[in-house]
Structure formats: C-alpha cells, structure tokens
Amino acid sequence: MNRCPDIAHAVRLLQMGEVVAVPTETVYGLGGDAKNPLAIRRIYATKGRPAGHPVIVHLAFEAPWTEWGQFNDHALALAKAFWPGPLTLILPRGTQALDEVTGTLPTIGLRVPSHPTAQALLRQFGSGIAAPSANRFGRISPTTADHVFMEFGEQIPILDGGPSKIGIESTIVDVSQERPALLRPGSIGQSAIEAVVGPMGHSDTVAPGSLKSHYAPMTSLLLSHAPEEDRIRLEKEGKTVAMLRAQPPQEYAQNLYAALRKMDTLGVDILI
C-alpha cells in the first residue's frame, strides 16, 4: 500500500498538486488542493467522475470560512451546532471558490470534519481540500485505507487514519436560500437540523454526490421487517443471500459499506 508516512508528507504532495486519500469520520476522501484547478481535474480523472459536478471543500475549524462561502444566520447557527462534524452546508460561493470545485454553480459545499487526522492535515496544509469519496465513480465509498487500496492500488498515496467512525456520507443542507432544505440525509437527522433552524423548506440545488449512479454496489440491499422469512423466500428463488446481524443504527451505518464491499467480493446477490 502506498501509505503517506506522516501528515507532513501528505501536505507536501497536496502542495505539489497531487491527489491524496484522506480519512474523515464519514468516509475516506480523494483530496486535492481546492485552490488548484489542475488538482481538481486530477480528482475527476482519478475517480472517472463526470466533469461539472460539484465537490465538497473540507476546511480546518480555524479556517476563514467566509472566504469560501457566504454565511447567513441559518448557516452560522448550523455551523455552530454541528461543526466540526458530518454536516455539509451548501452556501452562495465565496471569493476562493473555483468553477472546478462548484461545477460552475453559484453555490459551494463546505464541511469541517471532526476526524483528528483530517483536522491536523487541514491545519498544516493551511487551505481547503476538495475531497469527494475515495472510490471510482459509481462504486461503494471506502471507510478504511484498505478499501481505498482495493479501488486504486498503488496509484494513490493514502493517509491512514483508521476506520471511519460514522461510515456514511455527511448530511447535506442547503442554506443558500430563505429556508434551509435537506438535500442528502446522513447521521445528523432532519429533526436535529430543525431543532436549530426550524421547519425545513424545499430546494432544487444540485448537491455533491447526488448523481443517480453514485454508491452502486453489485449486491442488492433489502430492508426487511421479516428477515428470516425473506431469506427463505429468496433462497428458494435461487438467490445467494447474506444477512447483516441486528445492531444499533449507528453500528449499521458504520458497517454497511464494508459489508457491501465484502458481499460484492463474495458474489452475494442480496444482503438483508
């Protein structure tokens, strides 16, 4: 595995315009200098991702956020409540925002991750890091350094920060309009958001990670209230079936992508 020996090495690579896999509490990201158009294009090329789709910029907690996006009262309240953490805010773009990052949209997605390695990297780098999930386009998001290696081999240097504690992508809230709107659910639920900003509105804003072919495992996932009955029925139909053991919701989220990757490797048809 092409591991970065330390954070300083990862910083040097980012300063050179290279792409580095970085850990966050949600999933591993494919990181590049958010102020370097060439680095952003390298991210798109490495992922095989369609151009013109926005990517999230990750910032240090101490960073000058308002250079990247325009914060209204709702945005500031949500940032105070949930940053650092698994929340991405969609805001009117600021002066530092490149078209390559925003997909030429008038908005930008910003997040302040809570992962200590990610925060240390961002502080030492001293700028924003654009980082969609560190997988090939349409594949399952990685939650460990090994998952990233499965996707890219030695092609991408990896800053190993251990397994992602949350394991699913960040909640995305659009705060670029009068009423905030939930664009992508995540570990921070709608009720928690509304406790801060009141009832949510509706938005047609394009969110990072919202293309229809995102996060598409080969194994189908079945949510079931009668898992044993469904297993018997599906096996009678000739399907290869596996079951994810009962566990608290937070553990389900943390283990889901790893389980789907394993099922893809084993050739399982359906995971219950």
Residues of each region from the PLM?
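Active-site-adjacent structural elements in enzyme catalytic cores
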Residues: M1-I272
